[in-house]
UniProtKB/Swiss-Prot annotation:
GO terms for cellular component: cytoplasm; intermediate filament; nuclear envelope; nucleus. This is Lamin tail domain-containing protein 1. SUPFAM superfamilies: Lamin A/C globular tail domain. Residues 385-396 have a biased composition (Low complexity). Belongs to the intermediate filament family.
Length: 413
């Protein structure tokens, strides 16, 4: 008995040793064969043996854990004839099968066949899946096409065309004059102011005329032309500032040595006045900022003009609509009073049907004919009863009582 018990224990120990060697070989091969972007640590935990009372089965369990899910579950089942080691791994990995026999006690004679699962390195497509969604390509995939589509839209072209038209219109409307002389240009850098005679045949005298710049209605600089200066037809005259370092060439070019630069800000208005102070030409510069502001206002105006027809119905039409609705409400009762009042009057005149309790046959006298039991009663009795009932129901007129003296007289006669 002792020998028989020692033999299965020796076989179990040999199986455990072989299992540990196989697992060590698997771990080494996994360390050599695994090529992953991040390290994954695995540990093998051994659980105590479980004795089966019925078949004397020894089940040593071992389980390997990784970062995400268990790689394998090993179970050894030993019986009297044979013992099998099976492993259940991941779905993608192949199962490892190791078979041993109790008849051969030596480890050399035992036949083992095992297939160790190896982790294959990730392909380039898998690596791309990790990096997809980051970087410039992802941004361009989201917004690149939209930029291409919106780069040359008709709306942008319309805006640019509208801006150029605004600049042209603003240039015409900001430079105004009462006569032939106009202020054609005020240099943005403030180096000069140019006047032009728009007449094709007429010469204009500008001697002693005053060129001034006003800010908020107050003159900040004044320049007076010399005497006897005549501006030829379709000709220009330029007044240079000292910062321009230009040379005076009358009657076409003049230098204002006391003024380093002209003002070119939008809040400054350049005015040409007669010697008596009467303004004959004025100019207000325009910049990109003002142009964009005007463009925005024009766009808003266009939007409002598009919405105005419907907005008028809502903003202005609601007053008339409310007035008309109130009028209709006032008129409707007047028009509909006949149709609404008459049914009410008819309903008041209608008398609802009422059930009188005295009409019920059960509520009448049983001697009367309509009563259900009237046939059981003698007709003679019924006639008597009816006559007596009628006499009882008929009101008897009250006769005045005669005087006793009158009765006696009648009796004697």
């Amino acid at each position: 008995m002792m020998k028989e018990a020692s033999e299965p224990l020796a076989s179990v120990t040999s199986i455990n040793k072989q299992d540990s060697k196989v697992q060590d070989g698997e771990i080494r091969k996994e360390k050599i064969g695994t090529i992953t972007p991040s390290k994954q640590h695995s540990s093998v935990h051994f659980f105590p043996k479980i004795m089966d009372s019925d078949s004397t089965t020894l089940i040593p369990l071992s389980r390997s854990f990784s970062q995400e899910m268990p790689i394998g579950f090993y179970q050894i089942t030993s019986t009297q004839n044979s013992s099998t080691l099976s492993s259940r791994g991941q779905l993608a990995s192949k199962s490892t099968i190791l078979s041993c026999s109790h008849k051969d006690s030596s480890l050399g004679k035992q036949s083992t066949s095992s297939m160790v699962p190896r982790r294959q390195p990730q392909s380039s497509s898998d690596v791309d899946t990790y990096t997809f969604g980051n970087g410039e390509d992802y941004f361009l995939s989201l917004f690149g096409e939209s930029k291409k589509l919106t780069a040359h839209t008709p709306q942008a072209e319309n805006v640019s065309e509208h801006l150029s038209v605004i600049l042209e219109e603003v240039g015409q409307f900001t430079s105004s004059s009462l006569g032939e002389i106009k202020i054609a240009e005020v240099n943005i850098k403030g180096l000069f102011v140019r006047l032009v005679n728009s007449s094709n045949e007429k010469e204009v005298e500008i001697g002693n005329h005053i060129l001034q710049q006003n800010v908020n209605g107050h003159a900040v600089s004044l320049y007076q032309f010399p005497d006897n200066i005549t501006l030829q037809a379709n000709s220009t005259v330029t007044v240079w500032a000292a910062a321009s370092e230009a040379k005076p060439q009358p009657p076409t070019d003049f230098v204002w040595e006391e003024q380093s630069k002209f003002r070119s800000s939008p809040d400054c208005t350049t005015i040409l006045c007669k010697p008596n102070g009467e303004a004959i030409a004025w100019y207000t510069p325009i910049h990109w900022k003002q142009a964009w502001e005007k463009l925005e206002t024009d766009i808003e105006f266009e939007r409002c003009s598009v919405v105005v027809p419907s907005m008028r119905n809502h903003m202005f039409g609601w007053i008339t609509a409310s007035v008309s609705s109130t009028n209709e409400e006032k008129e409707e009762p007047i028009q509909k009073t006949p149709s609404q009042v008459y049914p009410v009057l008819y309903r008041e005149k209608e008398i609802p049907p009422t059930v009188l309790p005295n009409k019920s046959p059960w509520c009448r006298n049983p001697n009367t004919s309509p009563h259900p039991y009237s046939s059981l009663i003698d007709s003679h009795d019924s006639d008597i009863s009816e006559s007596s009932l009628d006499t009882q129901l008929k009101p008897q007129p009250t006769k005045p009582k005669p005087d006793p003296g009158t009765k006696k007289k009648k009796a004697k006669s």
